[in-house]
């Protein structure tokens, strides 16, 4: 029997209708895995050995009672076959410390999804720089004058922090906007933090597409997140509506270009964000949108993931 651990935000507070981690747990349970539940505070390191206080878990598709804890035990993380790291951002120093603990278990043979070192290496906004020919024009800087020059060149830009999620603190700055200076100062904290600027992509009106990649293989359907009227952000957390649809030709091209690199880095479950034919983000920490896609199309994305995990464990 496969022993699967999951590190996640409190399960008591999730929305099971759209929670991807919950979908993963349902599929793992369907396959007869033993489920071990952990939150960040349950992980610890003693003399170099990664350990955790885990609770065995059963889940069900029931809006009144979707989980039940069984026994509680202190275990070596290496006693688990696989651990899903599904803690949502912020990607802060605490998150980084947790990846080091998980990496100690990985060195003893436990499969970590996604690979701890690659979680540290691949910032969701910045990692697109390794595929610059696929992205919008992009500037990463602390310098207000550079941001202003980029805005003057393009006339219509998006500015965002490097560590936001769910569309937080994303600004669209159009030609002639008198607020460019204060937005630059706010995002860079007066030149003390890096931020990102990209040329505005009108294709956002048709949605910001979440394309999932499982162990290097693109999922054939995506979720287009369409902004509300007057909004430039499609993120569901920012009020966008989700519309599942098949991948376009350019979606396939981008996912097939990026997929092999992700697989080689041990990034087994990744969400690409694509606007039109441009790659805008590579989400590696806790990608979502599985349930919305699975509700619309006859596909089991979590099944693809568990197949990939089983194949890696069999090696």
UniProtKB/Swiss-Prot annotation:
It catalyses: gamma-L-glutamyl-L-cysteine + glycine + ATP = glutathione + ADP + phosphate + H(+). Binds 1 Mg(2+) or Mn(2+) ion per subunit. Pathway: Sulfur metabolism; glutathione biosynthesis; glutathione from L-cysteine and L-glutamate: step 2/2. Residues 125-310 form the ATP-grasp domain. Its EC number is 6.3.2.3. It is an enzyme of class 6 (ligase). SUPFAM superfamilies: Glutathione synthetase ATP-binding domain-like, PreATP-grasp domain. One of its GO terms (cellular component) is cytoplasm. Mg(2+) binds at residues 281, 283. It comes from the Bacteria. HAMAP family: GSH_S (MF_00162). NCBIfam families: glut_syn, PRK05246.1. This is Glutathione synthetase. It comes from Salmonella typhi.
């Amino acid at each position: 029997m496969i022993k699967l651990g999951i590190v996640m935000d409190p399960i008591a507070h999730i929305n099971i209708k759209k929670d991807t981690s919950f979908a993963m747990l349902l599929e793992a349970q369907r396959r007869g895995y033993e489920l071990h539940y952990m939150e960040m505070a349950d992980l610890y390191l003693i003399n170099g050995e990664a350990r955790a206080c885990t609770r065995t878990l059963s889940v069900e598709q029931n809006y009144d009672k979707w989980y039940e804890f069984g026994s509680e035990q202190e275990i070596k993380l290496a006693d688990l076959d696989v651990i899903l790291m599904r803690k949502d951002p912020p990607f802060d120093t605490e998150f980084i410390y947790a990846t080091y603990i998980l990496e100690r278990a990985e060195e003893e043979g436990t499969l970590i999804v996604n690979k701890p070192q690659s979680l540290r290496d691949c910032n969701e906004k910045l990692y697109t720089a390794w595929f610059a020919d696929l992205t919008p024009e992009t500037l990463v800087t602390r310098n207000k004058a550079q941001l202003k020059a980029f805005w003057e060149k393009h006339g219509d830009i998006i500015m965002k922090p490097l560590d936001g999620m769910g569309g937080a603190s994303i600004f669209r700055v159009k030609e002639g906007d008198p607020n460019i200076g204060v937005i630059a100062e706010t995002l860079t904290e007066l030149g003390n933090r890096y931020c990102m600027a990209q040329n505005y992509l009108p294709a956002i009106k048709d949605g910001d597409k979440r394309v999932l990649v499982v162990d290097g293989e693109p999922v054939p359907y995506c979720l287009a997140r369409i902004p509300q009227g007057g909004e430039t952000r499609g993120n569901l957390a920012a009020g966008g509506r989700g519309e599942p649809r098949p991948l376009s030709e350019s979606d396939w091209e981008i996912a097939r270009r990026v997929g092999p690199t992700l697989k080689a880095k041990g990034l087994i479950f990744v969400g690409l964000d694509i606007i039109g034919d441009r790659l805008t983000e590579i989400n590696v920490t806790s990608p979502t949108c599985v349930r919305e896609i699975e509700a619309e199309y006859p596909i089991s994305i979590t099944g693809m993931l568990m197949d990939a995990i089983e194949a890696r464990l069999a090696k």
